[in-house]
């Protein structure tokens, strides 16, 4: 099984958590694209979706899945999204695709977070994948200095503007032993919109694509 086939298996496995007549929260990324393909097969059975990025919105609309603004939706039964890293406590690093803020907002609304990954994303300790931080542009240098004080090595992701019009600093060389604490510390820096640690709101169910099939962790 190739890595993409493992992603596809995890994406399709998430369909079992989609409730009939519900509005589904949908994340962003290569694994989620497989989930969107799967979701299109039952678009007649759901009311539609809320998306965490312009890219996912475009893909869903092209497949005929109705996409709603989050402000017009009271609740979501599930949010399905991938991760760049996930540990044994269901804490994640997300935001490799720069959609972390919208992903975090949609995840906060959903009753259940279903994380879909291939087996390369499982780690014991978060931090080998650089931690994305969304920053208001004028605060870039200040925030970078504060991130250095926290032990990180921030690098400006050149040429990337988020869907919210902000920039991304990728923080390298962090061994993240206390994800919740670090998530709060970084979010407390003035000028930070949010960071890619999903620890205060981690995953509820993990679906891992492996060469032997999909493994479920709860």
UniProtKB/Swiss-Prot annotation:
Residues spanning the signal sequence: none
Positions annotated as active site in the UniProt record: 103
Pathway it belongs to? Carbohydrate degradation; pentose phosphate pathway; D-ribose 5-phosphate from D-ribulose 5-phosphate (non-oxidative stage): step 1/1
According to its UniProt record, the EC number is 5.3.1.6
Q: Please give the GO cellular component terms listed in this UniProt entry.
A: cytosol
Cite the GO molecular-function annotations of the record: ribose-5-phosphate isomerase activity
Q: Where does substrate bind?
A: 28-31, 81-84, 94-97, 121
Q: Which UniProt keywords apply?
A: Isomerase
UniProt enzyme class: isomerase
Give the Pfam families listed for this entry.
Answer: Rib_5-P_isom_A
Q: Which reaction does it catalyse?
A: aldehydo-D-ribose 5-phosphate = D-ribulose 5-phosphate
Report whether Cell membrane shows up as a keyword of the record: no
Q: Which HAMAP family match?
A: Rib_5P_isom_A
What is the designated name of this protein?
Answer: Ribose-5-phosphate isomerase A
User: Which gene is transcribed and translated to give this protein?
Assistant: rpiA
């Amino acid at each position: 099984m190739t890595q993409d086939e493992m992603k596809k298996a995890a994406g399709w496995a998430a369909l079992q958590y989609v409730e009939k007549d519900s509005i589904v929260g949908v994340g962003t990324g290569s694994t989620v694209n497989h989930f969107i393909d799967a979701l299109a097969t039952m678009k007649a059975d759901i009311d539609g979706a809320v998306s965490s990025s312009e890219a996912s919105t475009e893909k869903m609309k092209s497949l005929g899945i109705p996409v709603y603004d989050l402000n017009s939706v009271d609740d979501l039964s599930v949010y399905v999204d991938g991760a760049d890293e996930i540990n044994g406590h269901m804490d994640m690093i997300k935001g490799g695709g720069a959609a972390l803020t919208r992903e975090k907002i949609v995840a906060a609304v959903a009753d259940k977070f279903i994380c879909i990954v291939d087996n390369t994303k499982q780690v014991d300790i978060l931090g080998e994948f650089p931690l994305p931080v969304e920053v208001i542009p004028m605060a870039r240098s200040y925030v970078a200095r504060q991130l250095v004080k926290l032990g990180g090595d921030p690098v400006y992701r050149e040429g990337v503007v988020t869907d919210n019009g902000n920039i991304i600093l990728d923080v390298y060389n962090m061994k993240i032993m206390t994800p919740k604490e670090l998530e709060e510390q970084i979010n407390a820096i003035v000028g930070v919109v949010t960071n890619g640690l999903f620890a205060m709101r981690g995953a509820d169910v993990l679906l891992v694509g492996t060469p032997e099939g999909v493994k479920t962790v709860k």
